[in-house]
């Protein structure tokens, strides 16, 4: 999340460098979480994994919406890293589902998955610029809940 350094700087009064270092904990989680999401998906089932990870990221962003300047910095970092685990693992699990949606269009679906991820990044940065930070995180949590409900209707082909 490219807005996290700004969030930590504004919320905790950190220097730009310190805020960037703290926010890097979110990106650091990507190293194990994204492949881990794919692994979990392979092991326990794609749809079930996506449902659990999407519920987890909704809870994670709900937690992020509660972070404030009265929180200890370590607790805010812990919530961000927990939230990041579900987001990054969810990304790995999403790409595990791509070939199971419509096998004849796997490439197109993979391309759209990546493209719409970038569209989401732009939309959420605009939301961050216009909403109070707690409402911004609640917006993401609410979107995750909508995603969860949508996943309930997901049909996968069986190879």
Regions found by a protein language model. Name each.
Residues 1-27:
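Extracytoplasmic gate region of multi-pass secondary transporters
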Residues 27-35, 118, 122:
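Residue-level signature of mid-helix packing/kink "hotspots" within the transmembrane helices
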Residues 33-45:
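Helix-to-loop junctions at the C-terminal end of transmembrane segments
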Residues 43-54:
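Cytoplasmic membrane-interface "Motif A"-like loop-to-helix N-cap segments
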Residues 55-69:
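C-terminal ends and interior cores of transmembrane alpha-helices
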Residues 89-102:
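Intracellular juxtamembrane helix-capping segments at the cytosolic ends
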Residues 136-153:
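Symmetry-related core transmembrane helices of the 12-TM Major Facilitator Superfamily/SLC fold
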Residues 157-159:
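Conserved small/polar residues in nucleotide/adenosyl-binding loops
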């Amino acid at each position: 999340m490219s807005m996290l350094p700004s969030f930590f700087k504004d919320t905790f009064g950190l220097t730009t460098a310190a805020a960037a270092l703290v926010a890097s904990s979110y990106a650091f989680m990507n190293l194990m979480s994204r492949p881990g999401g794919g692994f979990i998906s392979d092991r326990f089932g794609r749809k079930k994994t996506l449902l659990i990870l999407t519920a987890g990221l909704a809870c994670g962003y709900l937690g992020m919406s509660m972070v404030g300047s009265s929180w200890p910095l370590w607790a805010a970092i812990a919530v961000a890293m927990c939230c990041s685990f579900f987001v990054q693992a969810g990304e790995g699990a999403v790409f595990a589902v791509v070939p199971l949606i419509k096998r004849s269009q796997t490439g197109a679906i993979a391309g759209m998955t990546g493209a719409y991820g970038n569209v989401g990044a732009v939309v959420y940065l605009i939301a961050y610029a216009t909403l109070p930070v707690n409402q911004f995180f609640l917006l993401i949590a609410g979107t995750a809940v909508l995603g969860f409900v949508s996943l309930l209707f997901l049909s996968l082909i069986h190879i």
